[in-house]
Structure formats: C-alpha cells, structure tokens
Amino acid sequence: MGVFNEYKRLAAGKLLIASANLLESNFKRTVLMMCEHNPQGSLGFILNRPMEFQVREAVAGFDEVDEPLHMGGPVQSNTVHFLHMRGDLIDGSEQILPGLYWGGDREELGYLLNTGVLKPSEIRFFLGYAGWSAGQLEAEFEEGSWYTADATPAMVFSGEYERMWSRTVRSKGGEYQLIANSPELPGLN
C-alpha cells in the first residue's frame, strides 16, 4: 500500500505503527493508538512501552492498580492519561472505537477501581502522549516513517509488549511479513 493510501487510512481508532526505518528513540518500533486525528493535528498513546514502575507507585489515588504505567509519548510527560473499556461507567469518556474509551472523570475512575467494580485489566494508564501539529504527521508518512492498521480493544490491553510491533506489522500481510521479521539493526548481522 502506498504512503498516500496509508495516510488516508489514518483516523482516531486506528493503530499508528512505526516503520522499520523510523529509528528515533521515542518511536522506534512502537505501536500507537490514535485518539484524535483532524486538520488541526493528531494525538495518540504508545501501547508497547511499559515503564518499570506500577500505577499504584506513581499515580495518587490508584493504590489498588498493580499494572505498569506506560510511556504514552514525549509530549507533556508529566500528565497522566488513560484508555479503558468501560465508557458505560465513567462519565466524560470519549469513545475511540466500540469497546475502547479515552479519559473521563478521574475521581469516579479511582472509586470504581478501588471498590473492584472496574478491573485493572480494563484500563491502561499513560504518562504523556504523542502529538503532531497540522501537517506534521502527513510529512512523516511521506518520509516513510509510519504504517497504519485497524485496531481492536484487545490489542490495546494485550500484555505482550515486546512482540506487539512485529505482530502488528505482520498482520498487514504481504511485504509487511518480511519487514516484521527484520532485525532492529540489520547492519549488525
């Protein structure tokens, strides 16, 4: 699929996948869930960059969440964001795709988690986000930095972080299957 067609497919609710050519450390071999994509810019969260500490250790009010906090991206890395499956329970949630929601009332979220109504496996917390201004992401597509793919809530909440990039690239089929199996630094082979 050509670069133009890849970019045309990009929308909120799609996956943004770093191409094998994208070596910039913030995004090398990342898979992002896109939550906004419009003429003003784009916003998403890196799905496969868990941090070395748990949500309960880093986010006040979420003492029962023994799940990793994730690096969502390099923008505003002092802010906490969350994706979850329960828009029916959390006021102010924005549906990204059926069964996947972004944000909502944090106090309500904390109560639901701490009382066991909401399971930690139904939510993913991110520190910061990935953001692009108008035209910036389109230019990166033209440079060959990104691919797109369809998303499901199961992909967002999968715990297989290390293999997420290769599995997602492979799922595109065709020439992408070869790319998915390529080593990170082919020149060192």
Curated annotation (Swiss-Prot):
Source organism, top-level taxon: Bacteria
Do you know which Gene3D superfamilies this protein is assigned to?
VC0467-like (3.40.1740.10)
Annotated Gene Ontology cellular component terms: cytosol
InterPro entries cross-referenced by the UniProt entry = AlgH-like
Q: Where are the transmembrane segments?
A: none
Instruction: Kindly name one Pfam family recorded for this protein.
Output: DUF179
The family this protein is said to belong to: Belongs to the UPF0301 (AlgH) family.
What protein name applies here? UPF0301 protein Plut_0637
